């Protein structure tokens, strides 16, 4: 009988202690002394570090833990922003430090998913399978690890690819008033990455839920979600979640840049990230800072609002071969008020980025879509980020459009113009018309080169200005059906230093002449 009792006691001990960590641990525990507006003031957390996650454990009336980020470390208290609903947190509640900074899931499992800034799925497609996480904040790659930008990101938009080329690893700002097509440019760029070996991340900050749902619907309709991750922090989310959203998206992009993901059976190490938009991000950070009682500066923004965006955008890079050769290209979006690009946040982001695509409401209302102001827009990478073929045909285009702008301004004050000036103005109008492009219809590089070659070599001089876009669409349809070999020839020779090669020139000119002979646009 004694043996059975001892055996029973031994089993009970084993059952009690199995799976239980009996080692003593030091836990930094504090209490909530005040809470409100998404900010909790805590006492007793004397070992917490900046940006550390703090945990409000479950209690009566709350089944799950709530987390926050410690941002203000003061002499006798800590102020933390709460990531979630603060209604169940009360004065006197217990809070513990976790010893870790905020991290998000990264890697293959996120492709095709819509997540919140904490990496949690919000698309109703079940849990995300992931093997690792990354901290959302990280120091940008150093000078030694980087490589100069020399490979293009084809946006599929003629005006951008020809005049303001974007390279892999570049940071190109999209700036303009509300309703000028900023998001449309970004979405068209994502759609055009199909089959280009590029993973796209779309970060929606402070937008309406309906608008985010519309973007996701568009990406699904065109088959772009299979290589896209959407990070959504809508206007209904707390300012704290809107503040961390772009950093979370950037961490996901850095994982692709450094380690890559499998896409259509190939390892892809190039990522494109769209921050839509950083104006709302700055407003969310201003709200958080004012609630934390940080001293306000110009336009009530805190003093480190420049650093807010510079530390984010500097993480975009093209790594050299020694470090994997991956890239992270950033397209930040900024919304201006009444075309004022000299306001605080726009000037900050303009000075951080490698160029800007400036969209104007006047051009948009006049029917120029995309409403690109070619005069103010610039890419500091320039022709280095273009294929040889595009550089060859776009060189003339820039000069002729610049001439047209000067002559058009002069023509307003001159009553009668000579024939040469009239011809140049008409030519400029044709080129401007050629740059109009419907939304969700990005063009591959071979189609862009074919059209621009025809335009810059006087083949459109007899086509009336109102019929230019119809001529372009019909000509490209003719090339696709009757002469696919010409498109293939352009694509295969796009990197040739002597583009257009005699073979390409002969085939392309023959196709243009054949099309003109069989069609009438008078």
Swiss-Prot record:
Its EC number is 7.1.2.2. Keywords: ATP synthesis, ATP-binding, Cell membrane, CF(1), Hydrogen ion transport, Ion transport, Membrane, Nucleotide-binding, Translocase, Transport. Its main location: membrane. It is a peripheral membrane protein. SUPFAM superfamilies: C-terminal domain of alpha and beta subunits of F1 ATP synthase, N-terminal domain of alpha and beta subunits of F1 ATP synthase, P-loop containing nucleoside triphosphate hydrolases. One of its GO terms (biological process) is proton motive force-driven ATP synthesis. Produces ATP from ADP in the presence of a proton gradient across the membrane. The alpha chain is a regulatory subunit. This is ATP synthase subunit alpha. The gene is atpA.
């Amino acid at each position: 009988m004694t043996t059975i009792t001892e055996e029973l006691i031994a089993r009970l001990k084993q059952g009690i202690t199995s799976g239980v960590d009996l080692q003593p641990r030091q836990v930094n525990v504090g209490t909530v002394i005040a809470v409100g507006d998404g900010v909790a003031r805590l006492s007793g957390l004397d070992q917490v570090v900046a940006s550390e996650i703090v945990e409000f454990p479950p209690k009566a009336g709350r089944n799950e833990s709530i987390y926050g980020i410690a941002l203000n470390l003061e002499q006798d208290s800590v102020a933390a922003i709460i990531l979630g609903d603060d209604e169940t947190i009360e004065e006197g509640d217990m809070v513990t430090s976790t010893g870790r900074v905020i991290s998000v899931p990264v890697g293959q499992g996120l492709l095709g998913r819509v997540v919140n800034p904490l990496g949690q799925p919000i698309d109703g497609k079940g849990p995300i399978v992931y093997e690792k996480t990354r901290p959302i904040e990280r120091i940008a790659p150093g000078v030694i690890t980087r490589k100069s930008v020399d490979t293009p990101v084809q946006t599929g938009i003629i005006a951008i690819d020809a005049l303001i080329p974007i390279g892999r690893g570049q940071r190109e700002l999209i700036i303009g008033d509300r309703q000028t097509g900023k998001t449309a440019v970004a979405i068209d760029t994502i759609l055009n990455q199909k089959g280009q070996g590029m993973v796209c991340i779309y970060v929606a900050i402070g937008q309406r839920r309906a608008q985010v749902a519309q973007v996701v619907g568009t990406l699904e309709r065109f088959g772009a979600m299979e290589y896209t991750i959407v990070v959504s922090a809508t206007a209904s989310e707390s300012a704290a979640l809107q503040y961390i959203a772009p950093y979370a998206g950037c961490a996901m992009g850095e994982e692709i840049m450094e380690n890559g993901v499998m896409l259509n059976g190939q390892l892809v190490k190039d990522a494109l990230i769209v921050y839509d938009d950083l104006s709302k991000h700055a407003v969310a950070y201003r709200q958080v800072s004012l609630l934390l009682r940080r001293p306000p500066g110009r336009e009530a923004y805190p003093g480190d609002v420049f650093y807010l965006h510079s530390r984010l955008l500097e993480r975009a890079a093209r790594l050299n071969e020694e470090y994997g050769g991956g890239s992270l290209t950033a397209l930040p979006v900024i919304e201006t008020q009444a075309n004022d690009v000299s306001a605080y946040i726009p000037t900050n982001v303009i000075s951080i980025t490698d160029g800007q695509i400036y969209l104007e409401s006047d051009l948009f209302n006049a029917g120029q879509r995309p409403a690109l102001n070619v005069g103010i827009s610039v890419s500091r990478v320039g022709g280095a980020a273009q294929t040889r073929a595009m550089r060859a045909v776009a060189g003339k285009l820039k000069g002729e459009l610049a001439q047209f702008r000067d002559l058009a301004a002069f023509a307003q004050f001159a009553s009668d113009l000579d024939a040469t000036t009239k011809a140049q103005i008409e030519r400029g109008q044709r080129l401007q018309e050629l740059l109009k492009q419907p939304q969700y219809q990005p063009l591959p590089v071979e189609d862009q080169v074919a059209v621009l070659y025809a335009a810059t070599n006087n083949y459109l001089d007899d086509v009336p200005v109102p019929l230019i876009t119809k001529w372009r669409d019909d000509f490209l349809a003719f090339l696709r059906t009757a002469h696919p070999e010409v498109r293939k020839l352009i694509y295969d020779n796009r990197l040739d230093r002597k583009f257009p090669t005699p073979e390409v020139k002969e085939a392309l000119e023959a196709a243009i002449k054949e099309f003109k002979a069989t069609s009438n646009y008078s």
